[in-house]
Amino acid sequence: MDDKLIHFGFSLGLNFMGYNVTDTNTPIDGEVYHARVSSLMPGCSVGFVTDLRLSRHLNLRFTPTLHFGEKTITYKTESGKPVEGILGNNEKVSVLALPIDIPLYLKWSAEREKNYRPYLIAGGGAHYDFGGDKEKPIYTKKWDFFVAFGLGCDLYMSWFKLCPEIRYQIGFNNVLTPVTDRPQLAVQNAFYTNALQRLTNQMITLTFNFE
């Protein structure tokens, strides 16, 4: 299989999605709010693999992947006290995420040892999120671009390769949609967005490629 110019496969896996959060640190009604990403909740991923052999150790891979998951942001007041009618302390807001990644990766493989072959992978691509609800407190922009890197190992079976792989993905863009671009947003929900200056995507994926 490693000697084929092109081969195909599919992937199944788990994802852990979140944000890198930057606060505004601007007082809102006399209180400063801080946001952080809560513990990452696992989601699932499914994708398709196209692999082009460039050399003995180098491959170019196209792996469009659809992810299902949820991101949760927790808000805390600087004083540690809730503000009546606005935000509570330790209040959580969930954002439904249904993104598709369209990446290109370079895969560098070591020499095969018996029935396994470790590798490193790096690349980037486009990210489009089908999730989100404009009526919710937090609404993110659809398009983003990212870089990713990781490692894995080809495990050779009789008829296919099983390739467990772990990757870390970092988005470039500020995906937060400001209140000024959301005229339909309820006033009581605007505080959640106004407390944030910047949101960038991040994701850890554990995938199993069948090739």
Give a label for each model feature:
Residues 1-42, 203, 209-211:
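Short glycine/proline- and aromatic-enriched beta-strand/turn motifs that initiate or cap beta-hairpins
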Residues 2, 52-56, 108-114, 155-157, ...:
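Outer-membrane beta-barrel strand-turn architecture
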Residues 4-6, 40-44, 96-100, 116, ...:
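Residues that define the transmembrane beta-barrel architecture of outer-membrane proteins
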Residues 6-12, 60-64, 100-102, 118-124, ...:
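Transmembrane beta-strands of outer-membrane beta-barrel proteins
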Residues 14-18, 66-70, 110, 124-130, ...:
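Transmembrane beta-strands of outer-membrane beta-barrel pores
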Residues 18, 58-60, 114, 159-162:
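Repeated loop/turn-to-beta-strand initiation elements of outer-membrane beta-barrel proteins
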Residues 22-37, 70-95, 131-140, 176-196:
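Flexible, solvent-exposed loop segments that connect beta-strands
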Residues 158-211:
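Predominantly the C-terminal beta-signal and adjacent terminal strand-loop region
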